[in-house]
Curated annotation (Swiss-Prot):
Optimum temperature is 16 to 42 degrees Celsius. Notoamides have been shown to exhibit antitumoral activities. Notoamides A-C show moderate cytotoxicity against HeLa and L1210 cells with IC(50) values in the range of 22-52 mg/ml, but the IC(50) value of notoamide D is greater than 100 mg/ml. Moreover, notoamide C induces G2/M-cell cycle arrest at a concentration of 6.3 mg/ml. Dimethylallyl diphosphate binds at R105, K191, Y193, K267, Y269, Q352, Y354, Y418, Y422. The keyword Ribonucleoprotein does not apply. Pathway: Alkaloid biosynthesis. Belongs to the tryptophan dimethylallyltransferase family. The gene is notC. Optimum pH is 6-9. This is 6-Hydroxy-7-prenyldeoxybrevianamide E synthase notC. It comes from Aspergillus sp. (strain MF297-2). It is an enzyme of class 2 (transferase).
Length: 426
């Protein structure tokens, strides 16, 4: 029988092996790969991905994602690159980690050479080529809902010209969409996210109307009750006699899975500019409408424990698009975010709350998360989390930084907490 040779430290890992004869020829592409590849390899290894899967996903990133990231961010040159909606520093790449299932996700804002120029002022072009290539690459990627939502939520060429003829728009906040991919079970799960603010400016149609109209056109069976509940909570035009949100809460994103429509979920995102526990609880219970859900109270209790551990200061967050400069630590805190999953699997919109930790001391966040992991039984994660995160940022002192942990998301399904952590790429 064949004798399996043991791996030695001299053998290259997946990142080094794929770098040896890399087809990336552009300087920006090479910088992106050198910056993101080693960290992705470490996170996958720490998540227990098999070696073959590490190769598969690193190759996917190298060949199909890196070419769509545009100019590599350089300090002092923020004006020379696309200002993405995706991250606080307006960088078009974000890595997140579902620590409950140890699944790695990458979000990115597809960019091309024309993005942000007069030839593509709102970065509408690159995503078409990117999604088409991914659909050709993997038969599980289905673009039907992407096309339908794109038609309703992205500005037309005529609307683009109309906006450009107005007073000068800021360069930030112009983005229309971004993508995300989960690396799971040897395959990929692709999602798309739409930002409607430019469509609102161009048409004057309120964002909640844009969203609910787009959802209605998808003709998804058995979600009418959940959609109606969300309308009454979020839209001033609907009323069921129960509390609705105030002007501090507003819609921000609409997302869906790009897969078989029968399995695709819709996610409706909102922002709350007033960060306070009572308001987070209101988002979680949908103004009390979800109290009949058997998972609601148990999830809320755990969310309160996480909130207390993170010790996020309460207050009104003024600017949701702050003018941050890459390389300069943030001096302010950011908003609360929540999304609601709409699917035939539940009569309730299922909430996921994002506690934004950007601007808080990273070591304090590590300690808080470690305590929460211990609380919910993520024993291995509790033991290794601090060491792992320090290895992802070897040149930073996490006792001094306050931007590495961008946010922590929490949901509760099937009697289990689900937690993801979102990391700054720089």
């Amino acid at each position: 029988m064949a004798i399996e040779e043991k791996s030695t430290s001299a053998e290259p890992g997946p990142y080094d092996a794929l770098s040896r004869f890399s087809s990336l020829t552009g300087e920006d592409d090479r910088k992106w790969w050198e910056h993101t590849g080693p960290v992705l390899e470490k996170v996958m290894r720490d998540s227990g991905y098999e070696l073959q899967s590490q190769y598969i996903y690193l190759y996917f990133v190298q060949q199909h994602l890196i070419p769509y990231l545009g100019k590599f961010p350089t300090r002092g040159q923020d004006d020379h690159r696309w200002q993405s909606n995706l991250t606080p520093y307006k960088v078009p790449y974000e890595l997140s980690w579902n620590v409950s299932h140890k699944v790695v996700r990458i979000s990115w804002d597809p960019v091309c050479d024309a993005s942000g120029t007069e030839n593509d002022a709102f970065n509408k072009k690159a995503i078409h080529d990117c999604t088409r290539q991914l659909a050709e690459l993997d038969s599980t990627v289905i673009l039907d809902r992407y096309r339908l939502l794109h038609k309703d939520l992205v500005i037309t060429d005529e609307e683009e010209q109309q906006l450009l003829r107005r007073d000068v728009l800021p360069k930030s906040g112009r983005g229309q969409h971004n993508l995300a991919v989960d690396f799971q079970e040897g395959g990929i799960t692709l999602k798309v996210y739409f930002y409607p603010y430019m469509k609102f400016l161009a048409t004057g149609t309120p964002i909640e109307e844009l969203f609910f109209s787009a959802i209605e056109k998808l003709r998804i069976a058995d979600i009418d009750e959940a959609v109606g509940m969300l309308k009454c909570f979020l839209s001033p035009k609907s009323d069921d006699g129960k509390p609705s949100v105030d002007e501090k809460v507003f819609p921000s994103l609409l997302a869906c899975d790009l897969c078989d429509p029968s399995k695709s979920r819709i996610k409706y995102y909102v922002i709350d500019k007033w960060v306070k526990w009572e308001r987070i609880a209101n988002l979680w219970t949908i103004g009390g409408r979800r109290l009949e859900d058997p998972y609601c109270a148990k999830g809320l209790a755990l969310l309160k424990e996480l909130w207390d551990l993170l010790a996020i200061p309460e207050g009104d967050r003024g600017d949701i698009w702050p003018n941050l400069v890459l390389g300069q630590p943030p001096t302010h805190l950011m908003t609360t975010i929540a999304n609601y999953t709409l699917s035939p699997a539940s009569r309730f919109p299922e909430p996921q709350v994002y506690l934004t930790t950007f601007g808080l001391n990273d070591m304090a966040i590590i300690d808080a998360l470690t305590a929460f992991y211990e609380r919910v039984g993520f024993t291995d994660m509790a033991k290794s989390y601090k060491k792992n995160v320090q290895s992802y940022y070897p040149n930073l002192d996490l006792n001094q930084t306050n931007w590495v942990h961008e946010a922590v998301s929490f949901s509760y399904r099937n009697s289990k907490p689900y937690l993801s952590v979102y990391y700054s790429p720089f």
